[in-house]
Amino acid sequence: MQPPNWQTISPPPLSLFVLEQGRAALELARVGPRRKLLDTAPRGDGHPVLVLPGLLAGDLSTIPLRGFLRALSYDARGWGLGVNVGPTDTLRTKLDDLLLRTREKHDQTVSLVGWSLGGIYARELARAHPDSVRCLITLGTPFRDISATHVARLVPIRPGGRSLRKAHELRAYLRTPVPVPTTSIFSKTDGIVHWQSCLEMEGPERENVEVACSHTGMGFHAETLAVVADRLAQPIGKWRYYAKRA
């Protein structure tokens, strides 16, 4: 699926936003599908995976996702930087150090999984250090238009408040493809981020994969976890487009 050519994208309908937290609670309670998935998902090779949380969330929010990946034999790690309050003057340096230290410790490339705003960070890390990144997976990340969310006013990097020229430059920069194998996971029923703002320009080693879940539930929804497990299991140099398992 190719992304739209629109310059701006509106947030999701209010009807989805109102239902968001209730849907996420139900998705978290559905333990059965996640347990079943552990029996069928491809096993990992033990390589390191950094998981970056969304806005106003921290490592606590990614425990289910990291626990799932560890059960598949990955060395899944949180970012260890507390609550994600948005970009700060020191955050980029801390993230650079985290990635490079992890790469050096394991002596192998690192996969990045970023949820929502965490996916923006992950994309910029991969852009800056492509030789240290094995693959990039984003969950409900609005890199095509950071303002296409119901929390955009909380994010300092939003285009709003800038001149039209500066806002256009920021959007154009964030949506530029990253030079590593990239999978963008999106949901058309996302109540926080408009799904069209998550669409990658498809091309070699770039893809969009649709799931059916809430934004807040992406990190523990079985369908999302299945995609993440499949993408991480690909051998280096043998990337292929996602094909849903029977």
Give the positions of each predicted feature.
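Flexible, membrane-associating and regulatory peripheral segments of lipid-active enzymes
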Residues: 1-49, 62, 67, 72, ...
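Alpha/beta hydrolase fold serine-hydrolase catalytic domain that processes acyl esters and thioesters
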Residues: 2-7, 13-26, 30, 150, ...
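Short secondary-structure boundary/capping segments
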Residues: 40-41, 173-176, 198-201
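Serine-dependent carboxylesterase/thioesterase catalytic core
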Residues: 47-60, 64, 68-181, 185
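C-terminal catalytic-base region of ester-bond hydrolases, centering on the histidine
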Residues: 179-246
